[in-house]
Amino acid sequence: MSQDILTEASKTKKGLRRQIDERGRELAYLQRKCRELGIPVLVVVEGLSAAGKGTIINQMIQPLDPRGFKVSCIASPNRDEQLRPFLWRFWRRTPSANRMAIFDRSWYRNLLDAEISGELNESELRKAYTDVRAFERQLREGGTTILKFFLRITKKEQAVRLATLQGNPATAWRVSDAVLARHARYKDYQKAVDHMFEETDLEEEAPWRRIDSKNLSNATFEALGYLVDALRKRVEQCKAGNPLFEGKRLTGLPCFSDAPSLKKSDLSLGLEKEAYREIIQARQSRIQELHNELYRLRIPLVIVYEGWDASGKGGNIRRLTEQMDPRGYEVIPVSAPNDVEKAHHYLWRFWTEFPKAGHVTIF
């Protein structure tokens, strides 16, 4: 975004409004092109309370076809989400091809709060950020365009805006005790935000765009500029036949399994029927015990079956689950993806079926 253009446009409110409207028209055009080319777009808008996230998002979507986007406002996870992997609820909201997903707060808000509260120690926080980078990289490798905005305001400006909200009966509810507590720890949050940038502001991946939002009109103009530039670049890449993902893909990953290769597997019968019945009954009883233990300790388990047609997957699953509590497991048959699944990232349909804590999912 050219600072000269922003400065010139800022000279008059009318001039800036014209520039914003022009950006909006271009954004609407690019939305149509992304839809035609099947480009999924994910936009993250983060910032401290009263930084103007809602205003910026509202200005983003005004020129867009409302059938082509969805805004997700991320609050604290509900009971069901708490029982799932951290990124589960965000995977479910990732955009399909030709649609745009806009997040008012995101997976980052959880990590900022967890760092401030001490809910996650240094090692756990490092792992969480590793998971976030992998999540974003997987989406990018699948063709998703990701833009991340962070709106900055000073503590003084935040205090003024919070007071204004509190003074209006229609908006006072937005200033909760949690919001005031975050404001009181402004410096701690700034430190956590800087740590977030260190972990996830990678120019080759999905860089952060930091925007001063003291003047919301200027901030809107700047955010629209970044969004238009990114979508224009992606559309041009697609038209030129270039791959959507430009980074280096991970290759040559080591195999951590000690399982023998199929060529070396012994497929001959090794047990007589009586011995088999005795062993399987003992092992099914043990599986029942372990299933109860998984539930007690709130440990989720995913079991994956692969094999040729008629190789015995169904029979094996039936024996596996014979003594398991049916309320604690689910079998997910996997076939060719349908049209909805094809329009999403390859892993989307599997993430949506991940088990709750203490439950078992068998694919």
Where are these regions (language model features)?
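Glycine-rich phosphate-binding loop of ATP-dependent small-molecule kinases
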Residues: 1-363
